[in-house]
Design a protein with these regions (language model features):
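N-terminal Sec signal peptide and the immediately downstream disordered periplasmic leader
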Residues: 1-65, 71-77, 189, 238
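Short acidic/polar hinge/loop motifs at secondary-structure boundaries
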Residues: 102-104, 110-142
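Flexible loop and strand-edge segments within Gram-negative outer membrane beta-barrel domains
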Residues: 241-257
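Extracytoplasmic
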Residues: 33-35, 49-52, 57, 65-68, ...
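Extracytoplasmic beta-strand/coil segments of soluble accessory domains associated
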Residues: 71, 75-118
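Non-catalytic regulatory/gating segments with a bias toward low-complexity or hydrophobic composition
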Residues: 54, 62, 73-74, 136-141, ...
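Soluble periplasmic/extracytoplasmic beta-strand elements of cell-envelope proteins
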Residues: 35-39, 53-58, 81-83, 91-95, ...
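Outer-membrane beta-barrel translocator/receptor signature
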Residues: 109-110, 122, 131-134, 145-228, ...
């Protein structure tokens, strides 16, 4: 009986030492975190240094989580609710603050939408698909000091990829799925000279409807949209540049059931 107890004790001590060595080695390994640079306060700074409640969604997260429109932000950004209203308008609320008037074409929202730092006044612009996006910044809480009017609830800034004079590059993505879904997106960067470059992006989405109007024999909840973007940049000096971009979006849908 004593021999068995001693044998058990020895095994226990050896196991303890083995686990202790594993934990000690794992703590010695250095963990490297990617630094996220945001422009939430109108200047480039690390996300950890920002004194506001900010959620930054990087390009890798956008692709991994399949974030294609504003509606998808509801699932990934805390305190943000995005919904379709009246079948065609997109309504954004942050911490419960959103539209405070009846829905119409001239109603002023309480969450400001900015594209590359430029205020987009029309709420109908929220229908656009995300096209060639580098980062999405969501700022919660009043932002009137830096982002002006219509930002009582917060602000959303969508930052697109800038043209680069470094090298020629191109990217194409094709997605298919149920209900005849076919999505094609592409982006190409053209360096024209050492100081001038352009970037062209394209996206097309086609999908059959989820439901059908039996009387009219018409599919509802379908998707049929196209997005185009042309972006130009000229490097004037090491600290200044001139940028011009234009984006076109067209959507033709039968509406919801």
């Amino acid at each position: 009986m004593k021999l068995r107890i001693l044998g058990y004790t020895n095994i226990y001590l050896l196991t303890f030492v083995f686990l202790f060595n594993i934990n000690l080695n794992s703590q010695e390994e250095e963990q490297v975190f990617e630094e996220v640079i945001v422009t939430a306060e109108k200047r480039d700074e690390s996300l950890q240094d920002v004194s506001q409640a900010v959620t930054a969604i990087t390009e890798n997260e956008i692709e991994a989580k399949n974030i294609t429109s504003f509606v998808d932000l509801t699932a990934v950004v805390p305190g943000v609710t995005v919904a379709k209203n009246e079948g065609y308008k997109t309504v954004i609320s942050i911490r419960g603050v959103g539209f405070e008037t009846n829905q119409n074409a001239i109603a002023a929202p309480s969450v400001a939408y900015h594209m590359d730092g430029i205020f987009i006044a029309s709420p109908f612009s929220l229908q656009t698909d995300f096209l060639d996006v580098e980062r999405i910044e969501v700022l919660r809480g009043p932002q009137g000091t830096l982002f002006g009017q219509n930002s009582t609830g917060g602000a959303i800034n969508v930052i697109s990829k800038k043209p680069s004079t470094d090298s020629l590059s191109s990217k194409v993505q094709v997605t298919s799925g149920d209900y005849g879904l076919l999505k094609v997106s592409s982006s190409t960067n053209f360096p024209i000279s050492d100081t001038l470059a352009t970037r062209f992006s394209f996206s097309s989405v086609r999908r059959d409807g989820f439901s059908e109007n039996i009387q009219l024999r018409q599919e509802l909840d379908d998707a049929n949209s196209i997005s185009l973007r042309s972006d130009w940049i000229m490097e004037l000096s090491d600290t200044s540049s001139l940028r011009f971009f234009a984006q076109y979006f067209d959507s033709d849908r039968n509406g919801a059931a």
